[in-house]
Amino acid sequence: MKKVLLFLIFLVSANLSAQLPSPTNGKKWEKVEQLSDEFNGNSIDTNKWYDYHPFWEGRAPSNFKKGNAFVSDGFLNLRSTLRKEPSSVQDPFKDIWVDAAAAVSKTKAQPGYYYEARFKASSLSMTSSFWFRVGQFSEIDVIEHIGNPSKENRQDDLPYQYHVNTHYYGKHAGLQPLGTEYKMPGRGRDNFYTYGFWWKSPNELLFYFNGKQVMRIVPRVPLDEELRMIFDTEVFPFATAGVANIGLPKPENLRDNSKNTMKVDWVRVYKLVDGTAAEDSSDAPIGSYISLKKTQGDGKFVTGEKDGSQLVARGSTVQSWEKFKVEKHPKGGITLKANSNGKYVQVQGSDINKPVRAAGDFQGDWEQFEWKSKGNGLVALKNVLTGKWLQAPWTENNAIIRPKGPVDNGWETFAWKKETSPTASTALSAQLETKTVDGIRVYPSPASETLTIEGVEGENGLRVFDSTGNPVLKKEGILGRKERLNVSGLIKGNYLLRTGSGEQTWFQKN
């Protein structure tokens, strides 16, 4: 998980990932971990990816260079670089002078899966692509995007174009490609957008933009073979393979790391399995604050520790820390937001022995629960990721809550009831108090809508992005002991603040 840097003035967690398509009856979406990656480490996960294309050298005048695909600052970076000056080769349209980038999955993609990736294109006259190939007869291009064509007459269309395509080879050689396109609201080089692809069947391909279906292709032949998932960059010296005549990349742009890099925030892949995704949660009190209490033993109320360390049944009465807000999870089921610190209740990955804690900054897989009403004011809560029920042992006083329950009986049941919402004055007071997180001290000035940040000395700048990935604020240079950020110009909505080293947090302005 990306490290949380600080709490901001308008502290509300937000989920910015795209909504999954509605599953077919009797099915639910399950994440395919081997094909999914948040790119949060310090290096590319070699269990999942090749950092080059082992099955193809690339498209002349570019070749893929091992290592030009790398992970840093929370992104998979695909950087295209200058191997030699184009003037030094005999034919700049055919001779190799550009080092391109590719990341190829080691696990094969399959029909039936849903694939989505959030990325920003490079500002080059090259493709920034998300596609599938390395089979016997087929290719599926989810997007081949031209961020900054050298042909000036294409600047008004190609940077806004979401182009999909299918190609046919081998036993189907001779069939013409079949594609379509969608005009995006902004340029791919300026914005992080989420591009989705549901390989619904061999005969139906659905394409999504920021969670909304925008295109559909019925391929010329059934596309039923497993393929590799690929992110890459390529030079297209001529109009070919469904890509327009865009012009060669400019050497000065290939030297500029602010322009030569396609940045992938994450890729997430899901498959349909039998079952329903927390659909029993339809009777959950969405939007209400509730308390949870052990049904036997010491009968204590569940408390969300403010430091986010754990949930523990230790409250004798319902106070601020014993209240949780029930919210709808975007993938089904619910989330619980702790009133103690504004964080989402989460498990710690698949480790069922670790405490449940109020530490989630967004509504992800760790924060997804099923609400199962047991009647008579009782409820059982199942974490969807682990498949286990939250448990408070009756035999322990001040019991720590863990996702260990194999069934929804006894220790796994809680008495619940609706509680009064925190008053506006209480909520305002909580927003305005001074925050100290990991040595970083943050305090707002509501009258002037500025935020003072201490403890970021030495960081190389910071930036604020809106929910579509557009940069809306920035502070450049090496940060000092005390920095101020004016947020008065921001409209209502969700935002991401990220420092130069990649530390970040989500916030919302109301």
Swiss-Prot record:
Q: Does Nucleus show up as a keyword for this record? A: no
Q: Which superkingdom is the protein from?
A: Bacteria
- GO cellular component terms listed in the entry, alphabetical order: periplasmic space
- Give this protein's Gene Ontology molecular function annotations: hydrolase activity, hydrolyzing O-glycosyl compounds
Gene3D superfamilies, A to Z: 2.60.120.200, 2.80.10.50
UniProt: substrate binding residues: 56, 59, 134, 139, 144, 234
Active-site residues are 139, 144
Domain GH16: start-end pairs: 18-275
According to its UniProt record, the EC number is 3.2.1.178
Chain coiled-coil ranges: none
Mainly localized where?
periplasm
Q: Which InterPro entries match?
A: Actin-crosslinking (IPR008999), ConA-like_dom_sf (IPR013320), GH16 (IPR000757), Secre_tail (IPR026444)
GO BP of this protein: carbohydrate metabolic process
**Family label:** Belongs to the glycosyl hydrolase 16 family.
**Name of the protein in question:** Beta-porphyranase A
Source organism: Zobellia galactanivorans (strain DSM 12802 / CCUG 47099 / CIP 106680 / NCIMB 13871 / Dsij)
